[in-house]
């Protein structure tokens, strides 16, 4: 694996291999590789807590040294292009670049970069490591994907998580459904849009998404009402209690409590939200190992 850019670029065999390797790192079954003498730069052009810190933790566990990079104090603020920034880091000896960028498909401009790139999110395009850690969490729970009913609720149109998980879950044989306000429907993703109350008793996984306020126009934001959204599309106690006994609740976070999900359900027994974060470290360790070996 030369780069990790999109879930659409991964075969199902590669997905299972990454999940297995991550699980072995988590259990201690797999010995940690020694990447002492390897250097990584994390380039985050959008804000991040979980993804950035998770990658940093994964890098530390694998023995990598991290090159400090802050967009606000770099030459990006002087107008330097993404390509020139990445080429500079390659030239000074970085072995791996982890990049989050607000532009969809930013990596298409980096074809002449000769070190591995891990996409940590591109605009509303793809978020492959989030999808992989979600798949790991689901596989831990069920041990399979074929036939699972997955309901993805939220801002489908603007969510890179929705797009990545749609492609990967479909490829693995799961049944994907969406629930979203009409304004956030994405017709390019061929899955049915359903009323949450019509399917809540039959789904195996409810995957809630954050509202992507930063990608909305002024008119769209003016129309948005958190209480109305929560009533029509959020997971409240009534809906939670209708879930099957084995069903689980997921969210890539950050969570807007009281909007996508009732606050006291974030750590309820069916919630795997913080388990996803835990798994993210081991999954990203597996990705880094594949990219650098």
From Swiss-Prot:
**What does the similarity note say?**
Belongs to the aspartate/ornithine carbamoyltransferase superfamily. ATCase family.
In what pathway does it function? Answer: Pyrimidine metabolism; UMP biosynthesis via de novo pathway; (S)-dihydroorotate from bicarbonate: step 2/3
Q: Give the source lineage, highest ranks first.
A: Bacteria, Bacillati, Bacillota, Bacilli, Bacillales
Enzymatic class: transferase
Per the entry, what this protein does is: Catalyzes the condensation of carbamoyl phosphate and aspartate to form carbamoyl aspartate and inorganic phosphate, the committed step in the de novo pyrimidine nucleotide biosynthesis pathway.
Instruction: Give the protein name, as stated in the record.
Output: Aspartate carbamoyltransferase catalytic subunit
Q: Which GO terms describe its biological process?
A: 'de novo' pyrimidine nucleobase biosynthetic process; 'de novo' UMP biosynthetic process; amino acid metabolic process
HAMAP family named in the record:
Asp_carb_tr (MF_00001)
Q: Which organism is it from?
A: Staphylococcus aureus (strain JH9)
Q: Which UniProt keywords apply?
A: Pyrimidine biosynthesis, Transferase
**Keyword presence, Methyltransferase:** no
From the UniProt record, list the reaction(s) this protein catalyses: carbamoyl phosphate + L-aspartate = N-carbamoyl-L-aspartate + phosphate + H(+)
GO molecular function (one): aspartate carbamoyltransferase activity
What NCBIfam families has UniProt attached to this entry?
A: asp_carb_tr, PRK00856.1
Tell me which EC number(s) this protein carries. 2.1.3.2
Residues bound to L-aspartate are: 78, 160, 210
* Stretches that traverse the bilayer: none
Provide GO CC annotations from the record. Answer: cytosol
């Amino acid at each position: 694996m030369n780069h990790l850019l999109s879930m659409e670029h991964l075969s199902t065999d590669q997905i299972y291999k990454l999940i297995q390797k991550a699980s072995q790192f988590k259990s201690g079954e797999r010995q940690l590789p020694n990447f002492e003498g390897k250097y990584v730069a994390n380039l985050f052009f959008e804000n991040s807590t979980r993804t950035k810190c998770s990658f940093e933790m994964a890098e530390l566990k694998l023995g990598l040294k991290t090159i400090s990079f802050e967009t606000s104090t770099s030459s990006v603020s002087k107008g330097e292009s993404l390509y020139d920034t990445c080429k500079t880091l390659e030239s000074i000896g970085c072995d791996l670049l982890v990049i989050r960028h607000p532009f969809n498909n930013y990596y298409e401009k980096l074809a002449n970069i000769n070190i591995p790139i891990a996409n940590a999110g591109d605009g509303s395009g793809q978020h492959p490591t989030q999808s992989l850690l979600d798949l790991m969490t689901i596989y831990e729970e069920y041990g399979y994907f074929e036939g699972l009913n997955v309901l993805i609720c939220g801002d489908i149109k603007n969510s890179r998580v929705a797009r990545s998980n749609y492609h990967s879950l479909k490829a693995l044989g799961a049944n994907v459904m969406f629930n979203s306000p009409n304004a956030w429907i994405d017709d390019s993703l061929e899955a049915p849009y359903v009323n949450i109350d019509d399917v809540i008793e039959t789904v195996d996984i409810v995957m809630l998404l954050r509202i992507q306020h930063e990608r909305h126009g002024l008119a769209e934001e003016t129309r948005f009402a958190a209480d109305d959204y929560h009533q029509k599309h959020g997971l409240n106690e009534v809906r939670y209690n209708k879930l099957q006994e084995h069903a689980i609740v997921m969210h890539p976070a950050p969570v807007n409590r009281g909007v996508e999900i009732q606050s006291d359900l974030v750590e309820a027994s069916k919630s795997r939200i913080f388990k996803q974060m835990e798994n993210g470290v081991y999954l990203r360790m597996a990705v880094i190992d594949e990219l650098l070996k």
